Amino acid sequence: LAAVIAFRDPLLSEGDPEAGFDEHGSAFERLSAFQFGFTDGPSACAAIDMREIGQRRGDLPVLLPEDQTGELPVTEQSVRSIIDAMGIMFSPAKPPPLSFKASEAEGCPDARPSPPASYCPATNTIVVDLDEMKVMGTQADTEDGGLASGDNTAYSVLISRYMQAIQHARGGLVLDNAEAALRTACLTGVATVKMSKTVTTPDGNTIALTAGDVDEAVSGILTNGLAASDVNGESVPSGFSRIDAFRVGVLGDEDRCFKRFA
């Protein structure tokens, strides 16, 4: 799976003359195709054509806007904006408050810390270790190839903790087992797609998914697994299963996640 990600198409801008030619797919698209073949056999592979790819791609951005990197540096303000955007998109009755005191995660009575972002069900609080999140969200040297990395490697983990708050609000769901970890990955995929449409936060900032963000998320899910982990930061051993759960969310909706990972 890591090799499939490493040989993804390069990230291009809208004005790039090579855009749209000789495409081989983003990391997410290539992973999806690999998983189709692995689980469903040759018939699933034969069904992949430009129409199927277009339907699966939907509104996910493929190209970067002109003169933009697609990277939103991790700061306290950007973290607050992501959380605000989640609140607008999912409208929970009791939005989880945000804390930047990393020590608060240590005192949670019903969950262990999972830095750089932790969720405490007892207090319905998301706790962020900003320094660790900055490190996770730093883009590696793209000249060297390898796995995708960048801002959404970190933000996808933050989003996953918000999706645990959404699960907690439903009531009756276990948040500290393998099913919870995969359900979180699935719901993180749902939230990621929702961000393909620009969200304006109360402070006037805009949050939107950019080309390359989904690849950064799946790379993080494969390497550190935190966006596909339970409330204690524990994930399933199989990277294939983690990415598959995220893909189910990207291509589905909340109900599908709750039914699939009950």
Write out the residue ranges for each language-model feature:
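Acidic/histidine-rich, surface-exposed loop or edge segments in extracytoplasmic proteins
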Residues: Q55-P73, K134-M136, H168
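Catalytic zinc-binding patch centered on the HExxH motif and its immediate surroundings
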Residues: A102-V127, K134-M136
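Acidic helix-start/capping segments at beta-turn-to-alpha-helix junctions
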Residues: L1-D9, T69-E71, K94-S114, G204-L209
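Long, well-structured alpha-helical subdomains associated
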Residues: L1-A44, M195-A262
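Second-shell loop/turn segments in exported
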Residues: P17-F21, D67-E76, D141-A148, G171-A178, ...
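Sec-exported extracytoplasmic/periplasmic mature domains
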Residues: A6-D9, Q35-T39, D84-S91, M163-G171, ...
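Soluble non-cytosolic domains of exported or imported proteins
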Residues: H24-F28, L72-R80, A148-V157, V174-L182, ...
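Active-site recognition of the HExxH zinc-binding catalytic motif
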Residues: V128, D144-G171, A181-A185, G189
